[in-house]
Each structure stands twice: as structure tokens, then as C-alpha cells.
Amino acid sequence: MSDVSTQSPKVGFVSLGCPKALVDSEQIITQLRAEGYEISGTYGGADLVVVNTCGFIDEAVQESLDAIGEALAENGKVIVTGCLGAKKDAAGQDIITSVHPKVLAVTGPHALGEVMEAVHTHLPKPHDPFIDLVPPQGIKLTPKHYAYLKISEGCNHRCSFCIIPSMRGDLVSRPVAEVMLEAENLLKAGVKELLVISQDTSAYGVDVKFRTGFWNGRPLKTRMTELVGALGELAAQYGAWVRLHYVYPYPSVDEVMPLMAEGKVLPYLDVPLQHAHPEVLKRMKRPANAEKTLDRIRAWREVCPELTIRSTFIAGFPGETEEEFQTLLDFIAEAELDRVGCFAYSPVEGATANDLPGALPDEVREERRARFMEVAERVSARRLQRKVGKTLRVLVDEVNQDGGIGRSSADAPEIDGLVYIAPPSKPYKRYKAGDFVSVKITGADGHDLWGEV
């Protein structure tokens, strides 16, 4: 990596966890560059290292602790931030400092100010920061053609299996003008896809009572429907996509369906359902009802037949009976969800679900997860097969010797399927990463599509 100035202090950065944590990392790196710090691609080339951690499940905790240990071994000066920074062990002690007492500082998630204060303490900032080196859209860790747009922080739900509210706090919605300005800067920089994220996108603005803000001289409510409409209008000026994630199936989501049917935003919803049996949902403390959800899904598809629905579920939750699990399998088959992920229940330290009776053996949880995925993949394969012979708009993510790899409107990066594109048969059909291309679909399996331009 080339150096802009050999005099500038260098910071190494490790980012772990979900897209929301990735946005936190982008904000920290943007501020570091704004203050004149350089970002080092190696531990050895850095004056100190910042590690943004994940603490949601045991595997993520261990990955974060391992990353901290590696940074300490390779560099020696480490500042830790992120969700694991807010977690305590059974004795009430900070998990990170009890395992790695030599870290310089520890903060929780969404702690830009605290991280920068720690950096300033251990690596004073340059006297003449090069503000002009930082692009208006900030420093991004995603490929340049797509970006995550975080609209709020925290969550008002208290699901029994989750500890995110204890780490990230209650819902705090970003001002609508601030969100729109960030979106505009990203689109001006060439981003082709905005992925709207939060802990609960449907609840955007609840905490400020849907306060009216202003954007480009016109009033705009701090509310999901109005924000999504404005983002769709803005993205249309650049020929870009807007994709919605973490959307709870509240009645207000019905208002977004016409926007999807009209092509203003992608006909795609990431809806975290988790289960379908009412008793399991009750134990999970989830705000959902399977019958109402089925009715809502049918109504959505009537308005927008092209709608793709992705969701995640938990198999083997404490107390889950075979009958309750079968209800979940029946729901998956009936709802015909396009994209589905499933986790075998794993206890999370600090979650109230740990105190529920009826914990299931590991082998039962894993067996149910496998059965669930068999059903889900059959549904997905049927729905994907319907696309064979159609021509889809595809955003190219990568080009290699075998052709291209991209995504359709039904595929979010990292979590959904891919479209494998044959090499162009003629020079005028060439494409590169970040291009939109029309792809005729020639084949499908349970997850991916194949086609040609």
C-alpha cells in the first residue's frame, strides 16, 4: 500500500461482525482519515490497531478474542470497540480485559467519540490533517458499487434470545436529512446499490414520534415509508437500487409495497421472522403472529408479485416440541419464502432465554436445523426454477476468466444467491464489476442462477 505521507501516524483496522458493525467501522475510518491518520494494511506497518468486535454468539466472541490476541502479538498496541466491548462475563467482569489485559482501551458499539479519544491518547493526531483526502461519502469497506446505509441504532424489542439492546441500547433514529445526505454522497460517488440497515427498519422514527425534517427544501417525515420513497426517487436519478433489510412485518410495511410494485425500490424484503408457532414466539418474546404474517405475505404478493422475501429462523429453541417444529416446517412450505437462513439455537451469555426450561440436546437442534433447510431449499429451488428463460437485470460484482458473478434484485450481497454470467460472446457485450447487465437465465439450482448476456 502506498503512503500519502511518511510523517502521518498509521492505524491498522480489523472489522468483524454484521453490516451495522461494518458501518461503525466505516465511520471510524472516515474520521481517522479526516484527522490525517493513514490506514495501514498490515499490523507491522501500523502504530496501533483498532479491532471492531462482535459479541452476539459464542463463535463470534471467540473470533473477536482471537483477532485481538493476534493484533496484540503482531503489533502490541490495540484499542477494542464493538459489541463485545459491552459484554460482561458471569462474574460481571469485562470479557475483553479479563482475557487480554494489555489492550489500551475498550469501548462498546457505535462509540466513534470514545474510539477517537482513545486513539488521540495513545497516538496523537497530526497537526495538519488533510481534510481534502477524505471523500464526501466517507471511507467504505465494501466494494465501491454498493454500500450499507444505516438509518438507526439500537432496538426497542427485548427478544429473549438476543442481547443486542443491552449492547447497542434502545432505538435511536438518525435525522432524515442526515440519512438522505449520506445517500446522495454515496450515489454521487458511484454506488449502484444502497442497502438500508438497522436493528428494526420498520420502527424508523418511532423514537422521535415521526418528526418532520427537511431535505432539499421540502418537508420529509422521519418514518420508513417516507424515507424509502425519498431514497427511491434519489436513487432513480442515478439508476441505482435501494434494498431494505431487517424489516419487521408491521402493518406499516404494507405502504411500501406500491413503491416496490412501481419499481422505485427493489421488490425485496429481509424480514426476521425467527419462528411460526405461537408458543415458541411467545417464549422468544417476538412481536409476531404466524397466521397474520401469512395473510400479510399473501397481501404483499398481490400488490407486488415479483416480491422476494428473505428471512431467518431458529430451530431447537428451548422447549420446542416436535409438533411446534412441524408447524414451522408447514409455515415455510406455505409461505414459499424465497431466501431462508436457519440457525440451530445457541445460548448467548446474558440472554433471558438461557433461563427457559426444556433446553434441547445439541444433536436435536442440529438435526432440526438440517430438516428445516431441506424444506427451505426445496421451496427456493422451485421459485428459482420459475426464472429460467426470463431476462433479469443483474449487478456485476466480479469478473474472472470464467465470466462474471453478479446479483439480481432478489439477491443481497453475502447472504443470498448469485448469478453466474457466461463470458460475453461479442465485444460490445463486455461488462465489468459495478455494471448493470441484462442476463437471460439458462439454469438454476436451489440457491444460484446461471445465464448469459
From Swiss-Prot:
Domain MTTase N-terminal: 9-124
Occurrences of domain TRAM (ranges): 385-453
Domain of life: Bacteria
Cofactor, free-text remark: Binds 2 [4Fe-4S] clusters. One cluster is coordinated with 3 cysteines and an exchangeable S-adenosyl-L-methionine.
Reactions accelerated catalytically: L-aspartate(89)-[ribosomal protein uS12]-hydrogen + (sulfur carrier)-SH + AH2 + 2 S-adenosyl-L-methionine = 3-methylsulfanyl-L-aspartate(89)-[ribosomal protein uS12]-hydrogen + (sulfur carrier)-H + 5'-deoxyadenosine + L-methionine + A + S-adenosyl-L-homocysteine + 2 H(+)
Record localization: Cytoplasm
Family note: Belongs to the methylthiotransferase family. RimO subfamily.
The name this protein goes by in its record: Ribosomal protein uS12 methylthiotransferase RimO
Gene name for this UniProt entry: rimO
